[in-house]
């Protein structure tokens, strides 16, 4: 009975939700009372056939499969969430030490990255600094070349004007050049000391006097210092003999030498070479034997503690003597100990292109060696650009004696000293130049000469005398050459 009541209640509820629901009661064939109710389908106007029933069942199966797939996907997501929750739970339950270790690892990684960035920054800064230095060096070289170009242009213009004047027959009359010219003579007043081109044109005819040059009582070089050493006056210079040619552009001009007073372990064969093209000249190449020098195999390379200037260096009694770059200071560098033993500023000496030889190259201060010792050739404002000679103490570089000549330094290409006498060369680029002046420190007298001198390669940037070998050493446009000489008897 309760089941019947529940059935009736369900029918009533369904009937309340559907207008087509009907409740009927009737006796069956056996006389029992039966209650029935019917509800109209909301989407079907009539009962489906058997095929339609199967289609509906298939639709239900598809829906069931879809729901099952959704359920599996939901289960997978729930599983993933459970795994994540488990990891979070483990992380929360981990001790502070584990967390600290993880943080330390991360911090170490960040530090390594920071160090790498700082290293890259330093490398970039160093590269930038190098570029700035190279730029400064190039600008300095550019300024120097522009200055030389301006000087050459002025000299060319002056030479052209002087040639035109000479062509018009306005040249002053030449006088007897065998006599010394007093500083205050009338003939001297006819010369313009500031016109370099004129002096070069007339250098083979007469000396060029400068005011306040010759002293009334010039110091005399003691003959006892010379002794019987075969000294005499230069009368002949032979043809150049080429020993070696520089391999690179840095060998355009330079200086090479041997020690006329060698000290152990060096011998009279030991040769030194310095390429002087560049802004920071520090390398000195040493060759134990002449054959090594000719073949280009140095036995040692010195690195100077300070850059040298131009081509005026010499080696004497085991030390290299050179002008410090950008200064009027002469430096003595002892080769055996590779240390600086003495430095001396030459009072009033021009430097950095103030009073160079005619070829330029910052050749303001030129060191030289002869039978009597160590010399320095330079000029000063007081001498108005005329060559000044000073005898140097080879130990401490103190100036022992000084002579002022009447030869304009910028009017000659180079100079060397033999037996206490200064000799100058007329041109660095003419194939047929001359040794055109001589100044005797023993008498204080200068005179013109005309001894042929060959510039085979037409760019002689260095000429020095070696008293031990009685030869001239020269650097002529990448080529290292020697000249035999002859001296007359005194």
From Swiss-Prot:
Broad class of the protein's primary localization: secreted
Keywords associated with the record: Calcium, Cell projection, Cilium, Coiled coil, Cytoplasmic vesicle, Disulfide bond, Endoplasmic reticulum, Extracellular matrix, Glycoprotein, Golgi apparatus, Lipoprotein, Membrane, Metal-binding, Mitochondrion, Mitochondrion inner membrane, Mitochondrion outer membrane, Palmitate, Secreted, Signal
InterPro entries, per database record: Olfac-like_dom (IPR003112), Olfactomedin-like_domain (IPR050605)
Tissue specificity note: Detected in eye aqueous humor (at protein level).
Signal peptide: 1-18
PTM text: Palmitoylated. Glycosylated.
Coiled-coil blocks: 55-170
Region (Disordered): 168-187
Site (Cleavage): 212-213
Lineage, top ranks: Eukaryota, Metazoa, Chordata, Craniata, Vertebrata
Subunit structure: Homodimer (via N-terminus). Can also form higher oligomers. Interacts with OLFM3, FN1, NRCAM, GLDN and NFASC. Interacts (via N-terminus) with MYL2. Interacts with SFRP1, FRZB, FZD7, FZD10, FZD1 and WIF1; regulates Wnt signaling. Interacts with SNTA1; regulates muscle hypertrophy. Interacts with ERBB2 and ERBB3; activates ERBB2-ERBB3 signaling pathway. Interacts with SNCG; affects its secretion and its aggregation.
GO CC terms: cilium; collagen-containing extracellular matrix; cytoplasmic vesicle; endoplasmic reticulum; extracellular exosome; extracellular space; Golgi apparatus; mitochondrial inner membrane
Location of the Olfactomedin-like domain: 230-489
Disulfide bonds: 231-419
Domain of life: Eukaryota
A biological process term (GO) from this entry: negative regulation of Rho protein signal transduction
Protein function: Secreted glycoprotein regulating the activation of different signaling pathways in adjacent cells to control different processes including cell adhesion, cell-matrix adhesion, cytoskeleton organization and cell migration. Promotes substrate adhesion, spreading and formation of focal contacts. Negatively regulates cell-matrix adhesion and stress fiber assembly through Rho protein signal transduction. Modulates the organization of actin cytoskeleton by stimulating the formation of stress fibers through interactions with components of Wnt signaling pathways.
Localization per Swiss-Prot or TrEMBL: Secreted; Golgi apparatus; Cytoplasmic vesicle; Secreted, Extracellular space
Protein name (record): Myocilin
Pfam family, one: OLF
Binding site for Ca(2+): 366, 414-415, 463-464
GO molecular function (one): fibronectin binding
Motif (Microbody targeting signal): 488-490
